[in-house]
């Protein structure tokens, strides 16, 4: 029987990491000899006893560059498994895991988290992506639209496993919204170009300057765009309306206390935060970006959609929601009826079935 290696060089605290914990905690009782390779310090992450951790030995290692982490984890993969039969479940840095799998003669299952739009327009990038990913033994994607795009642009077959979500009931409130009775907005995601939070800030600036609406935005996440977003907030006198809150462990507690959830990404896979907002019964406005939001919101049936970057339309949708909350609230109530799509046990069992196809050979 092959060793099972979970490959994730950088654990940064987001949707990918949440799926990592769900998957590892579920499969640890289903298989023996499970290893997790990462270049991150794992003191704060709750993995089960059956998961054997492989990390850099240097206690001082604290490099934040994902490329460097991927190189180090590739070295650890070769060092520890070059003479063993193994199966790699790659949740990140798939180029590295596929390449190394050929060196050590291992099987490899890769999970794609975000749609590969950036490779489509460049011929060489597209060729490289298609060639390398065709070497994977199996490709897992997290939405049906993702599967269609992968086949359409790269002629690659894949298996859809929707994100598993644990729905918990919480009444916890956050101090930022305490005693504030007007429009409470929340957005969650890494502060990166992909998440495109500047669109939301521009929309809210437009809202502030053109309508007499009192609002507050709680923006959860960390990343390299922090300074850029903070400058925009201060330059437009939005500091009383918007708080950059950094990373928060239990994001669902914050969603629950808001009136409106907004996602502004340029591209996604299947964003957990939208599903968590649905579970909390909070109305949603999201970009119609490739590939997951449209599927989660069922083409606008379960929430409002707008084109990426269109902050004017976003402003209008927020204003419309403020003036008439009933329509979007009806969509959020309806959304709860479709949460079965993200069933925790059913979707995680799909990982077990997929792994079993390769683990014994």
Labelled PLM ranges:
Residues 6-65, 147-151, 223-225:
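N-terminal strand-loop element at the rim of the active site
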Residues 145, 164:
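Carbohydrate-associated surface elements
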Residues 14-22, 183, 190-209, 224-230, ...:
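A conserved mid-protein helix/loop that constitutes part of the nucleotide-sugar donor-binding site
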Residues 230-246:
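Nucleotide-activated donor-binding/catalytic signature segment of Leloir-type glycosyltransferases, i.e.
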């Amino acid at each position: 029987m092959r060793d099972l290696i979970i490959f994730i060089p950088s654990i940064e605290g987001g949707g990918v990491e949440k799926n990592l914990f769900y998957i590892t905690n579920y499969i640890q009782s289903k298989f023996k000899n499970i290893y997790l390779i990462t270049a991150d310090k794992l003191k704060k992450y709750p993995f089960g006893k059956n998961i054997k951790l492989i990390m850099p030995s240097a206690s001082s290692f604290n490099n934040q560059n994902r490329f460097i982490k991927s190189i180090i984890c590739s070295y650890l993969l070769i060092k520890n498994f070059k003479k063993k039969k193994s199966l790699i479940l790659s949740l990140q840095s798939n180029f590295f895991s596929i390449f190394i799998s050929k060196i050590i003669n291992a099987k490899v299952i890769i999970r794609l988290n975000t749609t590969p739009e950036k490779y489509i327009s460049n011929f060489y990038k597209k060729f490289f992506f298609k060639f390398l990913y065709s070497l994977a033994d199996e490709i897992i994607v997290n939405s049906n639209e993702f599967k269609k795009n992968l086949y359409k642009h790269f002629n690659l077959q894949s298996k859809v496993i929707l994100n598993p979500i644990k729905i918990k009931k919480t009444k916890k409130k956050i101090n930022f919204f305490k005693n504030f009775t007007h429009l409470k907005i929340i957005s969650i995601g890494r502060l990166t170009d992909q998440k495109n939070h500047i669109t939301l800030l521009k929309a809210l600036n437009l809202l502030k300057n053109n309508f007499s609406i009192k609002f507050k935005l709680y923006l959860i996440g960390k990343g390299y765009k922090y300074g850029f977003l903070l400058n925009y907030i201060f330059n437009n006198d939005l500091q009383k309306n918007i708080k950059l809150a950094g990373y928060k462990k239990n994001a669902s507690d914050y969603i629950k206390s808001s009136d409106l959830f907004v996602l502004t990404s340029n591209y996604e896979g299947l964003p957990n935060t939208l599903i968590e907002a649905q579970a909390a019964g909070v109305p949603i406005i999201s970009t119609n970006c490739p590939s997951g939001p449209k599927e989660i919101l069922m083409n606008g049936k379960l929430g409002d959609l707008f084109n990426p970057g269109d902050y004017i339309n976003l402003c209008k949708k927020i204003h419309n929601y403020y003036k008439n909350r009933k329509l979007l609230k009806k969509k959020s109530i309806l959304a709860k009826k479709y949460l079965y799509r993200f069933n925790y046990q059913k979707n995680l069992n799909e990982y077990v079935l997929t792994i079993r196809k390769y683990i014994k050979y």
